[in-house]
């Protein structure tokens, strides 16, 4: 796992020096793709509703995979929670994380069996951070205390899924997924000024 720059930075996975372009990442059985760089940013997938992580190098024991997934040198498979409640009541999970430099990350998950063989679930999480950490700037004999600017992170993610089991041996599962990340890109640290206005927005 390679991290390019801490909070809000790109995080990729590669196996045995093949590079992130040759390491596939599947999300609930769907192999992901990135048209801009070819490298999947795994930081956008929170672990709050992940059921399992599986890394496969070479051949997969599952024969029901796509040709593109079978051609990958290695595959990181991310499987989300898909349990079926024993009753028909609504089950709600909520949590909130807080940290330094304005970090706030709430998470909520709803799941309910609405019929004997039909289950609905919804998941949403949001992450906000200012990332204005302090640092010292040395300019000859002058030392000033500055704060990182233009480093705000503002991302949200939501999923709605339906699972239908016509019998004990078969399952039909559909999901709607949305991701939106609007973040600022900090520039280099300059003397006398630290103004930077670059932004990046990713929507999936």
Name the predicted role of every residue range.
Residues 1-31:
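Extracytoplasmic beta-strand/coil segments of soluble accessory domains associated
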Residues 11, 72-74, 90-92, 104-108, ...:
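Hydrophobic, lipid-facing positions within transmembrane beta-strands of outer-membrane proteins
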Residues 14, 77, 93, 109, ...:
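Outer-membrane beta-barrel architecture
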Residues 23, 49, 86-92, 97, ...:
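Outer-envelope beta-barrel architecture signal
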Residues 47-93:
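A beta-strand signature from Gram-negative outer-membrane beta-barrel systems
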Residues 80, 112, 164-166:
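Residue-level signature of outer-membrane beta-barrel architecture
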Residues 94-98, 122-128, 174-180:
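Transmembrane beta-barrel strands of outer-membrane/channel proteins
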Residues 133, 145-155, 163-165, 169-204:
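Flexible loop and strand-edge segments within Gram-negative outer membrane beta-barrel domains
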């Amino acid at each position: 796992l390679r991290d390019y720059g801490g909070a809000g930075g790109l995080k990729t996975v590669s196996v045995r020096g093949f590079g992130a372009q040759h390491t596939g990442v599947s999300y609930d059985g769907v192999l992901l793709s990135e048209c801009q760089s070819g490298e999947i940013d795994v930081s956008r997938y929170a672990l709050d509703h992940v059921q399992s992580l599986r890394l496969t190098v070479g051949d997969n024991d599952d024969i029901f995979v796509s040709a593109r997934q079978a051609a990958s040198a290695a595959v990181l498979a991310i499987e989300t929670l898909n349990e079926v409640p024993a009753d028909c009541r609504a089950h709600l999970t909520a949590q909130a994380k807080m940290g330094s430099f304005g970090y706030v990350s709430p998470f909520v998950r709803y799941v309910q069996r609405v019929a004997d063989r039909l289950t609905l679930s919804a998941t949403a999480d949001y992450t906000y951070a200012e990332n204005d950490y302090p640092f010292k700037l040395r300019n000859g004999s002058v030392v000033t205390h500055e704060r990182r600017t233009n480093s705000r992170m503002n991302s949200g993610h939501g999923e709605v899924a339906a699972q239908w089991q016509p019998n004990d041996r078969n399952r039909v599962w559909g999901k709607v997924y949305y991701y939106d990340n609007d973040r600022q890109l900090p520039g280099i640290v300059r003397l006398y000024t630290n103004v930077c206005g670059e932004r990046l927005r990713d929507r999936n």
